[in-house]
Amino acid sequence: MSSNLAFLSLSLAESTASLGKSLEETRTRLTEKLKLVAGMALGFDQFAMHQTATGPGLSVEGKQTEQMSRKSAEDTRASSLSSDPDDGRAAQLAGQKGHVTPCIAGLIATSNPFLFTHMLALGAAYLGYDKYFGDGTSELLPFYGTRTLLSTLSPLDTPRLLDSMAAADRLSPKRSILSRFSRRKRSLDAPAPEPSGWDQKRKSRLPLGSLRLVLDILDRHLEALTTYVQQQIEIFRQAGVPLEASVTMTHNLNRLHVTRCQSRNNQMVIPCRWKDTTFFEELSNETNPGLTDEEQLEKRVKFHKLENAFNTVTGLGALEAMLDEDSVLLGGPAEESVARLYSDFHLGAAMNNWYFYDALNINKMLSRFQKVGTKVLKQYGLENLMNLATSHQAGSTASWDRTDIDTKLAKHHHYGSALRVRLYIMALLPQFTPHREGILSPVDFIREAFAGERSYAMSTARLKPLLSDDLVILGVPKGFSFLWLFEFLLEEDSPNALVAKRRALKRIPNWTKRLFSHSRSIPMLFRQFYKALNAGVFAKARRRTLDRSKTLLSRQLPEGWRDIVMDAFAFTAHSAALMQVVNYHSLFRDRTLNDLQEASYLATPPAFSIEDQSVMKRCDEQIYEWSRFGFSPDVLEADLHNETFKGKWENLRLETMPTPDTHQWWRRLHRAILDSLEIYQAHERHLKGMSDNLYTLVEDTIKNLQDGSSRDDTIFFGRIARGARESVGQKMWRGVKTFFLDLVRDVPGSDHAVWFGVGFNFPRIFQILRKMKEIALHAAGDQGSAILLDEAFVELVQETVAVRAQTYRRQPPTTLRNIGVIGLRPDYANLDTEQRSMEYQLSMCADHCVSLWVQILGFIYPYVLNPSLLTDYEKSFGTGHAIKKLDDPSYVNSFRYIFANDASLNFFEHNTPQDTRKALVSLKSGQAFMYANMMRFAGIAFEQLSMPYLAVSLQRQAPFMGQMVKDWVAKRSRSRKLAIVSVLSLGLIFAYTLLSALDIAQFLTDSGMKAIEDCSWNPIMQQMACVVVAGSGSLVAPTFAALSDVFKVGLYSGIGSTLIAASVVGNAYMIIRSQSRTILRTEMAIKNVAVKLWKQMRKYFSWVTRFTKRRKAILSTMMARATALAKNKKPRSETAATMTRSGDSVMDMLLQGVSPATPQRAQDGSR
């Protein structure tokens, strides 16, 4: 009991040093203070009134004291209404006017989650006083104060403390029979992670009553608070501070302040204040006054996020340190951080995000509140209370007969309904609200807050804080932070109902496996049939389903989703600018220009011309070289444009020269594109200053691409520009052409695509996708609508882009938009920088935002719905062998890769949108570059889904995957053509065989006929008389003729048809091969092995050849020199004997790396 009293003493801001003096005296003093604070000021005496009817609340000895305390509290309320409003604690609850129902103030008035935790802990101590601090013979339950609960916030430790306080057990979810017999077993050396306590249902052994309710509320609240603290730690981790959620807050406080506190007078004070950190110095507005408004806004948001996280981590760490009176962290800044932690009312706004309460859910909740409340109140004859609240007749307290309410409630003692009735009455009871200067019930207050009538923070009470003597103003921001408390009114088993709801949100829809799985056992035809069966087979039915999906999205998408649709992309390379060096590259005559030689590189750059080939073709050639020989380790090639490489050798400081990552292939290709644009700029420099739109556009694109972050953030995509309108004849010709091309798995070819560069704001993108997942889960009853959410969202994006980007003014009237035509404002070059940047983004978004969202919905959305679809890939790429092969260009065509996952080809066939797949097939240049960028985009996105191995592998292997897909497209088309030829060959062989068989049969018939006879009737003999016609007899017997023909056919086929038989087998293989992806990929793997062997052989023989040539060259040189030397010093006869030997020895020394001068001097010395 003494330990429990110690925790209670800390919760009531008492010193634990007095506990040893007199335990009974301390207990009495704490009891009185607890009654004053929790019983009256916080309103938990209302719960205790009901507790006496359903279970023990306070001890029996204290009931009389409780009644006196309650009577004194009522007297205090009465005096506060009639006398000075500052007298009494009840007046402190209401501010300067009137009184407010204490239980409402205690439960839902405060918007500070940490102070609310303190209130709930005190309420639990008050309601369960006998169970924690009583003198009974029964075993007391442990009690933990606020500091202990807040200092141990974690999904594992906090539920254990609360379970011990509530005498509760966590029930693990039941495993299905299939999961029990699953063949996938966890290895013995990898123990199963311990599940979070909040993901399990809770079964309390406490009797139904107020204490159990408060502890259930505290359990849910601390779960949300733990999530919030983990988010703050993640903010620091992204900022480079090594904090961890698995260590104590004191350790995190030390790490944070040691790394980020600034030293003053050569001394570092820990803990320090926010203004003394490096974050404050880096992000304050005074440091970078030259930033744009958007950059200033981003910087301001980051500043407030870090400040909030700093205050949270520092406050919780200092709160934990207060448990140790000898801690060195105690002091002024620590106490200030704790006070700030308990007084910042802005922290309550995060509760809305924790529990998904937007305006739609609030309306649903209030509607359900009225329906369930009417049913519950009707059992007591109090349904008129709901009618009064509904008809807005609760403007005065005279409408409520409190005596009648108490009389009816006194007749019922069943907790399951009586306590819920009291809570409903408390929610409907009118009370004075300071922000309205009038009477308003909490339910009406919620309606008003979410209706937008009050957009400012509304102060509702002035509560005397429980840790100091200063008054703290508490407010309720718009959104009403603790609406989730009403879940306890709407659900019979509210804590477990919330667990079930959370599990439902984590549940994976079954239809995702059928539609998005990469399993080869589910054919594409079955996927299409399944989708049509659920969404609607006929066009009208599908349209109705699509309209329902659009309605769901329009109502439930977060506020401001249309802004996210437009702001999710930052375009860095304009399509009209890239078209100059891709689509129109042959129009420029730049071979004679010397612009490239003017570049200040360390070495002369390779001479190339945009006239000879487009930049995308050069990128494809570079990818092809990488796929054959791997990434070049050349530092200059890896990062040619690095600042330290500019200038001359004498200006280069080797100690500061960076070592670039030679595996960042995207930087090299980014540099190639930028070089081409710079060549164009030099070619058209005469347009500078002439307000030319195109030249200005190229200048802006170069500036965007030269930005430091652009090299890593920009991803290049290409799209095929199609003709907007066609005549009837053109459509017929296109249909015929498409039909024949489909037979050979081809599409109409395109020389170039319309290319552009874009950066993605993945946090905002995932905000939309995760909300769509939530909508799909809630729409489980309408599976068709859930399946078509992606298509419905694309239509909404099209409507949003059409309005926001003003597409109507980017093409002439009555014409359709063609992305190959520039769509800029005519006065683009004359706009200022800010307006030009806005028009730059809008013009690109008008053409490409819809296709980018289609790309996102194809590559990311399926795995947001069902992340387990990527689990096999993550395991496969996480093996030691796969990690070693990260930079191996032959890995994508190896047997192990093909039969393990073949991820690149699966993503191409299952996730690539149809238009993009057609573009990859039709392009003549840029195929490998496009798919490499798509794989890099997927890799970056999968990092957000916690798939690190898959993400890194896709990014590093992207060029090799791009070349493999390019080869795959060509191989499939080639195999189909060979299959068609094989079908024709087999058809001709079959026709020849059939005709031959018919001919043989006819010959057998002809050669085996009987002789022709002339017959007549003999009347005397009464029979036919036949005479053989001369010359009509058979040549041979039928049996002999048949045997002879069979022998001849067998002989001829054995001699001449052996090739035909081989042709039949070969043609049959070609047909089967064309339809089998496994056979084609196996052929590619065999070719890969053969190429590797050939490279090894060439490498060996080339070394031998180089060695022989070098030896002969040096030998001939040495022989020539020796001959010249011999002519001057020795007779011819002496020289001839030693010439060859000396030349050979010198040659061998040179090849071995030994200087030839040393043995020569030794030889001279010996002489």
From Swiss-Prot:
Organism superkingdom: Eukaryota
Bilayer-spanning residue ranges: 978-998
Subcellular location: Secreted; Host cell membrane
Membrane-related topology note: Single-pass type I membrane protein
Keyword Transcription: no
Induction record: Readily detected in oocysts (at protein level). Specifically up-regulated in sporozoites, but not in tachyzoites and bradyzoites.
Ranges of compositional bias, category Basic and acidic residues: 68-77
Residues exposed to the Cytoplasmic side: 21-977
Main localisation: secreted
Disulphide bonds in the chain: C1015-C1026
Side of membrane Extracellular, spans: 999-1167
Sequence segments annotated as region (Disordered): 55-94
Any single Gene Ontology cellular-component annotation: membrane
Signal peptide range: 1-20
Stated family: Belongs to the apicomplexan parasites RON2 family.
Purpose of the protein: May play a role in host cell invasion.
Protein name: Rhoptry neck protein 2-like protein 2
